[in-house]
Amino acid sequence: MIKGIGLDIVEINRLAHVLSRQPRLPERILTLNEQDIFHALSEKRQLEFLAGRFAAKEAFAKAYGTGIGRHLSFHDIEIQKDEHGKPFIKSEKTKDDQVHVSITHTKEYAAAQVLIERLSS
């Protein structure tokens, strides 16, 4: 049974502008593991990576039903890749659920969709 669906889109240039004013933004959004990956990337790829992760975490928060705030933080959500490069979400908040995620980006935008599926009744 579907528990929630979330969708988010981020304008990459807008995120770049915020990042120029708030250089610690990646630390607010990314887990320590994600930060390690972020810092190993070129500057262009860093923006795409950060925008994609931000969109995925916002989409997850919408699917979860609370948004980012008191009950769910960016650090409660980690996007990892499987052995084939497919992204998946790791979160203690949905350990009994199946979470599906799709992340995409163009030169201008990053977008993500998340579906949370309840596995047990």
Curated annotation (Swiss-Prot):
Q: Provide a GO biological process annotation.
A: lysine biosynthetic process via aminoadipic acid
Lipid metabolism recorded as keyword? yes
Q: Lipid biosynthesis as a keyword?
A: yes
Catalytic activity reads: apo-[ACP] + CoA = holo-[ACP] + adenosine 3',5'-bisphosphate + H(+)
Please give the InterPro entries that the UniProt record associates with this protein: 4-PPantetheinyl_Trfase_dom (IPR008278), 4-PPantetheinyl_Trfase_dom_sf (IPR037143), ACPS (IPR002582), P-Pant_transferase_sf (IPR050559), Ppantetheine-prot_Trfase_dom (IPR004568)
Any one cellular component term from GO for this entry? cytosol
Any one GO molecular-function label of the UniProt entry: magnesium ion binding
The residues that hold Mg(2+) are 8, 58
Give the top-level enzyme category: transferase
Residue runs in coiled coils? none
Listed SUPFAM superfamilies: 4'-phosphopantetheinyl transferase
Organism domain of life = Bacteria
Tell me which cofactor or cofactors this protein depends on.
Answer: Mg(2+)
Q: What does this protein do?
A: Transfers the 4'-phosphopantetheine moiety from coenzyme A to a Ser of acyl-carrier-protein.
Record's family?
Belongs to the P-Pant transferase superfamily. AcpS family.
What is the designated name of this protein?
Holo-[acyl-carrier-protein] synthase
Q: Which gene encodes it?
A: acpS
